[in-house]
From Swiss-Prot:
Name of the gene: gcvH
Source superkingdom: Bacteria
Organism name: Sinorhizobium fredii (strain NBRC 101917 / NGR234)
Secretion signal span: none
Function: The glycine cleavage system catalyzes the degradation of glycine. The H protein shuttles the methylamine group of glycine from the P protein to the T protein.
Listed GO biological process terms: glycine decarboxylation via glycine cleavage system
The keyword Ion transport belongs to this UniProt entry's keyword annotation: no
Cofactor(s) recorded in Swiss-Prot or TrEMBL: (R)-lipoate
Domain Lipoyl-binding: 17-99
Homology family: Belongs to the GcvH family.
Name this polypeptide is given: Glycine cleavage system H protein
Annotated disulfide bonds: none
Amino acid sequence: MLKFTEEHEWLKVEGGVATVGITEHAAGQLGDLVFVELPEAGATFSKGDSAATVESVKAASDVYCPLDGEIVEINQAIVDDPSLVNSDPQGAAWFFKLKLADPRSADNLLDEAAYKELVG
C-alpha cells in the first residue's frame, strides 16, 4: 500500500512496517541534496516529530515522522551519497523503515490521487 503525507513524505506499508522517504515533488523543490541525517535504529517517534534532516544548496529541511512508531532500519546509502535522493526519491533513496505502533493508522493518509491533487 502506497500512501503520502501533506508534508511530502511517501510510505510503502507492508506487514506493519512502513518504508518512508520524500516524494519526487519534495526532492525537486529542495534541489541538489548535499547532506542527509537519519535517526538511529531503535529510536521511537510520534507522528509529526522531526525524524531526519536534509540539506540542499538551497536550504535545510526536516523530514517528519508520518506515523507513531519505531525506526527498525535506515538507508545508509543516502547518508553516504545524498544525490541518490535527487535521482530516485521514491525508490532506492528511501530514508528509514518504521515499525508502526498501529498499522491501521496508515489508512488515514493520502492516496496517490489525493497527493497529486495536493501538489497540482
